Amino acid sequence: MARIVVLISGSGSNLQALIDAQKQGQLGEDAHIVSVISSSKKAYGLTRAADNNIPTKVCSLYPYTKGIAKEDKAARAKARSQFENDLAKLVLEEKPDVIICAGWLLILGSTFLSQLQSVPILNLHPALPGCFDGTTHAIEMAWRKCQDENKPLTAGCMVHYVIEEVDKGEPLVVKKLEIIPGEETLEQYEQRVHDAEHIAIVEATYKVLQQLHK
């Protein structure tokens, strides 16, 4: 069985795409989501997982940094490292073949990545390679750039391998979308991106699992 661990922070719409794909055999015959780990106990994605009998865990950064002043960078870095170490332990307990960051909003640093070197980690980013790296506002930034420059813009989303440099890992699946000035609202473009993300995350998961089993 191919074991998938999914990391989330919010509504879990991309998690739902993976759950639906698993039911339809689109991730591979033996692929199963064995755990969903959320950085927020309020994430609706936890409900989605529970509704589909997928075990869940919560690993929030807040308890680690609570009470530490933002100016105390050394203490915050130490707390962050402890958080990543504990997160890595939770993930490793599941013996994953692949880890999918599906709307996971926290940067995975060296403490986490060094313990998961043998496991491919994928991240969904709502922009093309080299565009709007390291921001959670990539969709709005692309749409506004198109409107401000008043000319068509090719944007989209990608699924890439996670490395220490944020959003700089090798792209696995890229979906391009054309934005035309004045043709759609930000909300309409955002929906197009999300629709493309749901396809991309399934394709990327299937692709990496097929490569692992060659």
Swiss-Prot record:
<feature type="site" description="Raises pKa of active site His">
    <location>
        <position position="167"/>
    </location>
</feature>
<feature type="binding site">
    <location>
        <position position="123"/>
    </location>
    <ligand>
        <name>(6R)-10-formyltetrahydrofolate</name>
    </ligand>
</feature>
<protein>
    <recommendedName>
        <fullName>Phosphoribosylglycinamide formyltransferase</fullName>
        <ecNumber>2.1.2.2</ecNumber>
    </recommendedName>
</protein>
<comment type="similarity">
    <text>Belongs to the GART family.</text>
</comment>
<feature type="binding site">
    <location>
        <begin position="12"/>
        <end position="14"/>
    </location>
    <ligand>
        <name>N(1)-(5-phospho-beta-D-ribosyl)glycinamide</name>
    </ligand>
</feature>
<comment type="pathway">
    <text>Purine metabolism; IMP biosynthesis via de novo pathway; N(2)-formyl-N(1)-(5-phospho-D-ribosyl)glycinamide from N(1)-(5-phospho-D-ribosyl)glycinamide (10-formyl THF route): step 1/1.</text>
</comment>
<dbReference type="InterPro" id="IPR004607">
    <property type="entry name" value="GART"/>
</dbReference>
<feature type="binding site">
    <location>
        <begin position="105"/>
        <end position="108"/>
    </location>
    <ligand>
        <name>(6R)-10-formyltetrahydrofolate</name>
    </ligand>
</feature>
<dbReference type="GO" id="GO:0005634">
    <property type="term" value="C:nucleus"/>
</dbReference>
<dbReference type="InterPro" id="IPR002376">
    <property type="entry name" value="Formyl_transf_N"/>
</dbReference>
<dbReference type="GO" id="GO:0005737">
    <property type="term" value="C:cytoplasm"/>
</dbReference>
<dbReference type="GO" id="GO:0046084">
    <property type="term" value="P:adenine biosynthetic process"/>
</dbReference>
<dbReference type="GO" id="GO:0006164">
    <property type="term" value="P:purine nucleotide biosynthetic process"/>
</dbReference>
<dbReference type="GO" id="GO:0006189">
    <property type="term" value="P:'de novo' IMP biosynthetic process"/>
</dbReference>
<feature type="active site" description="Proton donor">
    <location>
        <position position="125"/>
    </location>
</feature>
<keyword id="KW-0808">Transferase</keyword>
<dbReference type="InterPro" id="IPR036477">
    <property type="entry name" value="Formyl_transf_N_sf"/>
</dbReference>
<feature type="binding site">
    <location>
        <position position="197"/>
    </location>
    <ligand>
        <name>N(1)-(5-phospho-beta-D-ribosyl)glycinamide</name>
    </ligand>
</feature>
<dbReference type="Pfam" id="PF00551">
    <property type="entry name" value="Formyl_trans_N"/>
</dbReference>
<dbReference type="GO" id="GO:0004644">
    <property type="term" value="F:phosphoribosylglycinamide formyltransferase activity"/>
</dbReference>
<keyword id="KW-0658">Purine biosynthesis</keyword>
<dbReference type="InterPro" id="IPR001555">
    <property type="entry name" value="GART_AS"/>
</dbReference>
<feature type="binding site">
    <location>
        <position position="167"/>
    </location>
    <ligand>
        <name>(6R)-10-formyltetrahydrofolate</name>
    </ligand>
</feature>
